[in-house]
Amino acid sequence: LVNVIGGGYSEASVTANGAPPNRLLSHRTASNPDVAGKVDPRIKAAIAIAPWGMQNGFWDAAGLAGVRTPVLFVAGSADVVAQYETGTKAIYKGAVNAERWLLTFVNANHNAGAPIPAPIETYRYSERMKSYPFLHYADAVWDSRAPRRDG
């Protein structure tokens, strides 16, 4: 999402571990003069839920300065995936040219802001996984699922 609203990827991201092959990200880097022109004008505002990449060098100051779309960043302060201080909060701070807000779920992990209903099958213990698959969707501190209405 950060790239879609004007944030250009860093040069380091083009060849980083996990980057797409053939330098595909080079078309969306901050150094590419066409990046600013590729922001869809229909997007008037955005919500970035736990955006990933800052902690791995996919974003830098130059790239984040390209964000000009108003954006609400949502993150958990205990996010172990996107990170908080060095991840989402750093992206928020770096988007200096955008009207922006940061909503922090205190002590929440990566999934707190994403109320994705878990498939019913994930509530059963998996012998193969030696855990409950639901834990992939759950947050121990913030339960963002809608309350059950079945009785």
Show which residues each predicted segment covers:
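Active-site-adjacent alpha-helix of alpha/beta-hydrolase-fold enzymes
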Residues: A65-R148
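Primarily recognizes the serine-hydrolase "nucleophile elbow" in alpha/beta-hydrolase
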Residues: L1-D60, G66
